[in-house]
Amino acid sequence: MKTSHTLGMIAAALVLSACGSAGRGLGGALLSPFDPKPGGYATLNLGGDNGNSIIKKDETIRIHDAEKGGTKSYNANDKFDISHKKQNKITSLGFELLNANKQKVESGELDIYKLSYSAVVGKRIQKRFDGTTGEEIKNFNPYFTVESVQGRFTKEAEKPKSGIVNYQGIAFAGQDNQGRLNYNINFGNNTGSGTITGLKGEFHKQTIELAQADLTKRSSDYYGLSGDAKINGNNRGEYHLNLFGPKADEVA
């Protein structure tokens, strides 16, 4: 049986996120894969372990969210409410990052892409500042990076034992959100592969191949895939994704 889910992606380290309706008629999951809708993953953890945090334990972040009354400060123990933000849509919020001495060290935009059971947070760093003097660093080149991928993991007992699931949706890297991603997971032989097309900039008019990778059990009780990202057969990096949702509804 072949089924379909919707999928979106932040493409810097080629991190993917996807949503669907496993167990409730998978064939209908692609009726509106690009349409924003309410609900979905509700809360971001700002701190965290294993290099998956938005800020470090001694840092403070100021986030500007007009829907929540303007700019507020948060530390690594705080959670950030995104329940009012729409799924299948990139939400961009201005931020300032402060070090342990409360000195501003960078500013830019947080790009949040959320689905039903997961969220991906990217950071467009537009300015950097000296952590001691607070002066802006000249000739700084802005860049985009994926900061955190989090959500409700698919547990071992919940992973499908058979069938091919096709994940489709948006591919984006910062302000470039015109790309399309297509990824298949074969739960019968536990492998996955796909492509990214339509990105601008360095990858304009090129197909990024997400080479076949094995679906394996990660640390405690969740599953993921890691493989090579190629252009014209040449390795250009790696991609990593994990399964999210009670019925392998999403990958991120």
Provide a role label for each language-model segment.
Residues 1-7:
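Bacterial Sec-dependent N-terminal signal peptides
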Residues 20-252:
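Mature soluble binding/inhibitory domains
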Residues 7-8, 229:
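Generic detector of short alpha-helix boundary/capping microenvironments
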